[in-house]
């Protein structure tokens, strides 16, 4: 306890630096999942991908990043196991951030796409096992988290298969694929915007003071989705778009439409990634800051400091700009 009282401010500053390091590594490495395919397909260049991803990663981290942070902060280990030794929890969280941040940067330097979530959860579990033991781990919560690592790829594969089959039947296997793509492309745009808005409004905007009911969230999201669909219809019917398509009888026009859809979904994925993975950096930081601010109190709900979320968002954007190119190239063209 004396450690926290005497060196509390220094510990917060050091943890903030380590949190920024972790966010830097996440931005540099994990963003390849969002933009690598767009680069590999030739839709955009690596430089364009970095600029686009920075914008949406930052937006996702700030607007919708607070929800997952609570899980990293107190959903993996039992905070009450450290009630009588809060300094151990503080030092353990700092060690976890340092280890995870260094590993992500090393992996990025080597061009290896790795998971920031796996890294930080493993680090937190490791320090808890060494200091307190297996009783400090919330195994039920952890089982759900680990289960999602297996369920998510399966669900993503199923959804991707359904969308692909749907696209083939509605667009590619028709006699006029370009005409069909112009017809159904705006629908895909609207669905993407609808999902993005639902997640952002319902999960992320509470920390900026916007609390809406389920029906209000649904209505706003549906309205924005319809607007996006209408914009898509108008653009695909415009002379500007027609002039960009050289072969209207073949698949070049279809590729042009799907390149726009791919870019839109990549932006949505970057936003979702920012909202989810920023928690890996700020969760431990939020825990340390709250414990020191409350004089060593570990248990009970805590309010996240206002500066924590923006710090993680900026760190992710900075890491993406400085080191994101190598991993993005691996996913885009190296696999």
Predicted regions and their residues:
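Alpha-helical transmembrane segments and immediately membrane-proximal extracytoplasmic
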Residues: 1-335
């Amino acid at each position: 306890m004396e450690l926290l009282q005497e060196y509390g401010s220094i510990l917060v500053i050091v943890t903030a630096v380590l949190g920024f390091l972790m966010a830097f590594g996440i931005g540099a490495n994990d963003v390849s999942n969002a933009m690598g395919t767009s680069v590999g397909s030739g839709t955009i260049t690596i430089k364009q991908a970095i600029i686009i991803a920075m914008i949406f990663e930052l937006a996702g981290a700030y607007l919708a990043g607070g929800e997952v942070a609570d899980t990293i902060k107190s959903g993996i280990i039992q905070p009450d196991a450290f009630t009588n030794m809060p300094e151990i929890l503080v030092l353990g969280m700092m060690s976890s951030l340092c280890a995870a941040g260094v590993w992500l940067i090393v992996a990025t330097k080597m061009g290896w796409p790795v998971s920031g979530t796996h890294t930080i959860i493993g680090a937190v579990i490791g320090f808890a096992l060494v200091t307190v033991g297996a009783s400090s781990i919330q195994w039920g919560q952890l089982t759900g988290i680990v289960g999602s690592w297996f369920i998510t790829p399966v669900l993503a594969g199923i959804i991707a298969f359904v969308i692909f089959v749907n696209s083939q039947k509605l667009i590619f296997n028709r006699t006029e694929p370009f005409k069909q793509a112009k017809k159904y492309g705006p629908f895909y745009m609207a669905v993407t915007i609808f999902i993005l808005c639902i997640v952002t409004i319902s999960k992320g905007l509470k920390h900026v003071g916007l609390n809406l009911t389920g029906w209000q969230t649904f209505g706003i999201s549906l309205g924005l989705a319809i607007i996006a669909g209408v914009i898509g219809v108008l653009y695909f019917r415009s002379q500007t778009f027609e002039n960009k398509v050289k072969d209207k009888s073949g698949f070049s026009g279809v590729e042009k439409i799907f390149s726009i859809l791919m870019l839109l979904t990549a932006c949505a994925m970057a936003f979702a990634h920012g909202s989810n993975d920023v928690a890996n950096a700020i969760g431990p930081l939020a825990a340390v800051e709250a414990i020191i601010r409350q004089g060593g109190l570990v248990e009970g709900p805590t309010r996240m400091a206002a500066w924590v979320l923006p710090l993680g968002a900026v760190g992710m954007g900075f890491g993406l700009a400085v080191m994101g190119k190598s991993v993005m190239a691996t996913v885009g063209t190296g696999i």
